[in-house]
Regions:
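A residue-level marker of the well-folded mature domains of exported/periplasmic proteins
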Residues: 27-330
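Gram-negative bacterial Sec-dependent N-terminal signal peptides
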Residues: 7-26
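Short, Lys/Arg-enriched N-terminal segments with co-localized hydrophobic residues
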Residues: 1-7
Length: 330
């Protein structure tokens, strides 16, 4: 009888292990987009592209949610965890504080955060060296400018967007030490990510000062910047996703930030406690050349930018990071 009892217990344990493994295998990953939504043609849409790629290749479904106000961040994260989603991806730095709280409450669930660092054993942090990619498009802007004046339009005024701006200015001045850079931020609240009208207004004000190339790191607000550039016959630079196709002929290039790869890889499996830093060397950022802008980028421009890219990867050019000490050291 003792032997039979042990056998029953063993079967029960094995059944539990198999059930847990099956539940884990069947768990659906989830992605929570931030303000602007998954069709913002920029940051969130890049995350959406990564999720869709995973879905297409795996043949499996995933969960997602588009927040419309700050309170929904924590609500959505907790709902996904309660539902058993795994892993759960928070897109954007603004989800950091709530995701840290929820991850502590659900220590057996796996999470990932993009554009922020959370030091927990069940959270993978994915950050980018935006200043390196911005350096390259800054060079491109200065080399393409006929007036010697280039512009920058940021979204919400936060250190992360200042990092874009600082890298852009460094690249522009590397290509042309005499270049003038005009810069504006759209606002100080999350609404700054989705205000195309304000983006257009800021771009037009820069054009009036002689700017003929403008880089927008502003989420959905950038759509207004790009349209203003097209209407004025100026050049614009996209961000996060490859936005060259939006206005062929006036989109000089895009500073591509591979949020799509970050989400795709996280869906395949997170590495809790790991901080994954993606720069030029890792293929996390770059500038985009395709059929929509190849006529705007001549061979000499590309040669100079590619040389700088190689030097950054080799460590010969050090691009200052605004977020290192909240200052732009040009």
């Amino acid at each position: 009888m003792p032997l039979l009892g042990n056998s029953v217990k063993l079967r029960n344990v094995l059944s539990l292990v198999v059930a847990c493994a099956a539940a884990s295998a069947l768990a659906e990953p989830a992605v929570i987009y931030d303000m602007g939504g998954k069709f913002d043609k920029s940051f969130n849409e890049a995350a959406f592209a990564g999720a869709e790629r995973w879905k297409k290749e795996s043949g499996k479904p995933y969960l997602d949610f588009e927040i419309s106000n700050a309170a929904q961040r924590e609500q959505a994260q907790r709902r996904m965890a309660e539902r058993g989603a795994d892993p759960i991806i928070g897109v954007g730095f603004a989800q950091g504080s709530s995701l840290e709280k929820v991850a502590k409450e659900f220590p057996k669930a796996n999470f990932a955060i993009i554009d922020s660092v959370i030091k927990l054993p069940n959270v993978e942090s994915i950050v980018f060296k935006e200043h390196e990619g911005s350096f390259l498009v800054g060079m491109m802007a200065a080399l393409a400018s006929k007036t010697g004046k280039v512009g920058f339009v940021g979204g919400m005024d936060i250190p992360l967007i200042r990092r874009f701006q600082c890298g852009y200015e460094q690249g522009a001045k590397y290509a042309n030490p005499k270049v003038e850079v005009s810069a504006n931020m759209t606002g100080t609240s999350p609404a700054a990510w989705n205000d195309p009208a304000k983006g257009s207004e800021l771009a037009k004000s820069q054009f009036a000062k002689g700017v003929d190339v403008v880089f927008a790191a502003a989420g959905g607000t950038g759509v207004g910047v790009y349209q203003a550039a097209k209407d004025a016959g100026k050049l614009a630079i996209g961000v996060d996703s490859n936005q060259n196709h939006l206005h062929p002929g006036t989109m000089l290039t895009s500073m591509v930030k591979r949020v799509d790869i970050a989400v795709y890889n996280a869906f395949k499996g997170t590495k809790g406690g790991n901080v994954n830093v993606l720069g030029l060397k890792e293929g996390g950022v770059d500038y985009a050349i395709d059929q929509y802008n190849e006529k705007l980028v001549n061979a000499e421009m590309k040669k100079k930018v590619d040389a700088a890219k190689a030097d950054i990867i080799a460590g010969k050019i050090k691009v200052a990071d605004y977020m290192a000490d909240n200052a732009c050291k040009l």
